[in-house]
């Protein structure tokens, strides 16, 4: 009887730890798949015009229905700031890119399972806070104060893989479709120039 009681107490103590690890991994994996801020100096990322700096300011807020739920959502307010190398060193109006992403874990975490699969879908807004014409008089795109705004969806999956050769290291593979519906656009010229469908793939490795 005493032996059975000890075994029962051990099981009772282990179950909350396993549940806690499951919850922690869910939150950790979801946030690892979310937006990350950065600051770059001089050139920025993907910009042709000289910059002093570019900064992406972002934070992620995880929402879950209950602690042991396999479904959750992340709200991400995001802004991008740029200071140009011009007279008076102006800081341009920020780009606003808030989004909400919904996640669903297809299989519960298990210590012996190396792969965990998630589905996700996002609703994203992107605008630059300007009110000028989209095109210049010569027909080129107005990158100075041209009004830019778009809304779109992202749908895809990401897969986590625990790397056995490196402790506490996880590999993420993500693939998703970005779709810009015409009825959600303020300007059809954006779709004519850039299209409304894109396919993204990326691989990340995190050490927690």
PLM feature segments, named:
Residues 19-65, 100:
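Short glycine/proline- and aromatic-enriched beta-strand/turn motifs that initiate or cap beta-hairpins
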């Amino acid at each position: 009887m005493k032996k059975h009681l000890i075994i029962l107490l051990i099981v009772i103590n282990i179950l909350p730890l396993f549940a806690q690890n499951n919850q922690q991994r869910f939150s950790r994996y979801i946030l690892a798949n979310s937006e990350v801020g950065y600051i770059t100096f001089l050139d920025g990322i993907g910009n042709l015009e000289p910059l002093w700096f570019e900064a992406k300011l972002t934070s992620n807020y995880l929402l879950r229905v209950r602690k042991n739920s396999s479904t959750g959502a992340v709200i991400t307010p995001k802004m991008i700031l740029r200071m140009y190398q011009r007279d008076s060193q102006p800081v341009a109006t920020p780009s606003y890119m808030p989004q909400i992403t919904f996640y669903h874990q297809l299989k519960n975490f298990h210590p012996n399972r190396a792969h965990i699969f998630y589905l996700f879908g996002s609703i994203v807004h992107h605008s630059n806070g300007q009110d000028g014409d989209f095109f210049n008089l010569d027909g080129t795109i107005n990158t100075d104060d041209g009004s830019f705004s778009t809304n779109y969806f992202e749908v895809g999956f990401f897969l986590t893989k625990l790397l056995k050769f490196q402790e506490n290291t996880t590999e993420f593979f993500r693939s998703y479709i970005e779709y810009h519906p015409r009825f959600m656009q303020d300007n059809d010229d954006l779709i004519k120039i850039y299209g409304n469908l894109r396919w993204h793939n990326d691989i990340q490795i995190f050490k927690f």
